[in-house]
Amino acid sequence: MAKFDVYDLSKKKVGELDLADAVFAGEVNEHLFYEVVKAKLASDRSGTHAVKNRSLVSGGGKKPWKQKHTGRARQGSTRASQWVGGGKAMGPKPRDYSYDVPKKVRKAALRSALALRSKDQKLVIVQEWKPEGPKTAAAAKVLAALGAKKALVVDDAANLALARSVRNLAGSDFLAVEGLNVYDILRHDALVLTADTAKKLEASLS
């Protein structure tokens, strides 16, 4: 088990938390990051790109001139791809870029991302963070005290006040623990977890 300090919102140590080495202190596998981030970005692509081929371009139904004895190259339509205003040959079509990554790979990559933030000393665990209402200035002050200005804050989805407070901060964001992913961990400088959230991650990733 790895020991982690637990802080209050002013970064005063209030206790320690034992967490599984396999989840928070394992080996960092950067290739797993590549696999899951690539899949995430692929699934985010809209894939709506399209061009008109010769069957979709309007007009061009009539043969421009007779087949023989004109001295010109034979043509069947003024909407063939070699004509100005013609359809595109073999152009892009709408498609779905998403693909599945095995569940074991996704879990291993998430464990590796947590271990990376832990080794870089960019993982901060707070006892709890339950603001009375959405107060962005107060959230900025807390993150500054924790040394985590551009941070990903993770807690229960029900903590709406915290979510709304953090999401107004440039460079910081809030995620529900169920939606935690490698891409968002890596694109933020620090990771802030509540003690309960850390235990939930330990249980789900062990």
From Swiss-Prot:
GO terms for molecular function: rRNA binding; structural constituent of ribosome. InterPro entries: Ribosomal_uL4 (IPR002136), Ribosomal_uL4-like (IPR013005), Ribosomal_uL4_dom_sf (IPR023574). It holds the Pfam family Ribosomal_L4. Residues 48-97 are annotated as: Disordered. One of its GO terms (biological process) is translation. Keywords: Ribonucleoprotein, Ribosomal protein, RNA-binding, rRNA-binding. SUPFAM superfamilies: Ribosomal protein L4. It comes from the Bacteria. GO terms for cellular component: ribonucleoprotein complex; ribosome. Residues 63-72 have a biased composition (Basic residues). NCBIfam families: rplD_bact. Belongs to the universal ribosomal protein uL4 family. One of the primary rRNA binding proteins, this protein initially binds near the 5'-end of the 23S rRNA. It is important during the early stages of 50S assembly. It makes multiple contacts with different domains of the 23S rRNA in the assembled 50S subunit and ribosome. Forms part of the polypeptide exit tunnel. Part of the 50S ribosomal subunit. This is Large ribosomal subunit protein uL4. It comes from Anaeromyxobacter dehalogenans (strain 2CP-C). The lineage of its organism: Bacteria, Pseudomonadati, Myxococcota, Myxococcia, Myxococcales.
